[in-house]
């Protein structure tokens, strides 16, 4: 469920005058400065398109350098407002991680609590309201002197809207490092309704956003609960507690030695077997015949799939980013040829990811190993997948990671 998209749709409606009814007795907004030659969006008759430079005073922050020489933890230090202090999706910046000494004030810009800010570098084009006094660096723009024509909250939501986001992205286009030049921001037009209508729009947005926030929280909690239940069900399944045992079913034959210490109790007819007793393991050919990536192609008509960890998605082999090797390249490979029903298991990087091949053809990259059921037919494919997904096996794998940057 895309909650961010819901918020964006509401903002789209808001800046086009479609979120709340227009007030019939409200006079039209006075045209401030020149109207745009081409209007970006259709808006109600009582609204006006106003260039930000005519609506508000915009200033850029400043940075004392080197900043390390100005940082302090003294009580008389001034809050140093960084983009990292802003939480994406939050309207407010309520605290700052660092402070600077008062001497740095000459080389920065001091902003009062309640100021409206906009990021103009790094993650540019995101507005925030500052809840503390502080100094802003040159990655921030500050807005002021707009109260005669716009409420702070309405202007915040306009700057947050998909319309303004698109305008900012367009203004930043072409640069190697995507930054918002202050002069370009000043040229952006924004839709301004009558003040009374602005209050209504803000109130309705806050009402809807609060409902979305509650729904999103409930959805996340439900996802967490579903994950917990899934793990519990899988664990009960591999312990023989999920379904009743069949009285007429013979016991599983013990293949190999019984473990000295069993991980947990299982039904009497079950047996503890190693994977090696029920599965064959086959690595890919990692010798001189291993194909270089530069020799592979994205053209599916040229040969056979060369399957790597990135192609294992949701227990299936995804065609996204799938590369192909020629039939001659596959013919030279001494091992790692995929057959229908094979379990392709990741042993490097994304350790423990797996998927099942639904047809013959292709070969595996060095990050994978093939798990292939032995002729004893002791384990079903679906049951194997549940074992591999179970908390027991996940813990087993985690205990045996080698601790390197790339687990294997």
Model-identified regions with their sequence ranges:
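Short coil/turn segments at secondary-structure boundaries
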Residues: 22-27, 65-72, 170-172, 244-250, ...
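Sequence-specific dsDNA recognition surfaces
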Residues: 38, 53-70, 84-113, 136, ...
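A short beta-sheet element
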Residues: 82-84, 94-160, 181, 308-309, ...
């Amino acid at each position: 469920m895309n909650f961010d998209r819901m918020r964006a749709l509401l903002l789209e409606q808001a800046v086009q005058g479609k979120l709340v009814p227009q007030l019939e007795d409200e006079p039209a907004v006075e045209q401030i400065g020149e109207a745009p030659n081409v209007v970006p969006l259709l808006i109600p008759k009582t609204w006006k398109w106003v260039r930000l430079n005519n609506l508000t005073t915009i200033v850029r922050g400043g940075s004392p350098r080197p900043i390390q020489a100005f940082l302090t933890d003294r009580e008389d230090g001034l809050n140093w407002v960084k983009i990292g202090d802003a939480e994406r999706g939050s309207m407010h910046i309520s605290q700052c991680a660092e402070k600077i000494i008062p001497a740095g004030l000459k080389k920065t810009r001091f902003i009062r609590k309640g100021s409206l800010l906009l990021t103009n570098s790094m993650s540019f084009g995101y507005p925030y309201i500052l809840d503390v006094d502080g100094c802003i660096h040159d990655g921030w723009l500050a807005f002021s002197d707009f109260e005669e024509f716009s409420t702070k909250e309405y202007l915040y939501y306009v700057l947050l809207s998909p319309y303004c986001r698109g305008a900012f992205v367009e203004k930043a286009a072409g640069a190697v490092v995507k930054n918002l030049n202050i002069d370009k921001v000043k040229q952006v037009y924004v839709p301004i309704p009558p003040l009374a209508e602005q209050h209504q729009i803000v109130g309705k947005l806050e009402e809807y956003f609060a409902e979305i926030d509650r729904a999103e929280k409930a959805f996340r909690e439900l996802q967490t609960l579903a994950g917990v239940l899934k793990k519990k069900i899988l664990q009960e399944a591999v312990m023989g507690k999920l379904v009743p045992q069949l009285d007429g079913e013979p016991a599983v034959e013990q293949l190999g030695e019984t473990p000295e210490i069993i991980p947990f109790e299982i039904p009497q007819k079950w047996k503890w077997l190693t994977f090696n007793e029920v599965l064959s393991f086959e690595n890919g050919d990692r010798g001189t015949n291993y194909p270089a990536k530069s020799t592979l192609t994205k053209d599916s008509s040229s040969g056979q799939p060369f399957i790597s960890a990135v192609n294992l998605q949701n227990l299936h082999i995804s065609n996204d980013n799938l590369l192909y090797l020629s039939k001659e390249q596959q013919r030279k490979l001494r091992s790692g040829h995929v057959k229908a029903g094979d379990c392709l298991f990741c042993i490097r990087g994304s350790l423990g990811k797996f998927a099942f091949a639904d047809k013959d053809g292709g070969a595996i990259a060095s990050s994978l190993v093939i798990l292939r059921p032995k002729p004893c037919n002791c384990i079903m494919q679906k049951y194997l997948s549940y074992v591999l997904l179970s908390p027991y096996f996940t813990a087993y794998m985690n205990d045996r990671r080698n601790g390197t940057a790339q687990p294997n």
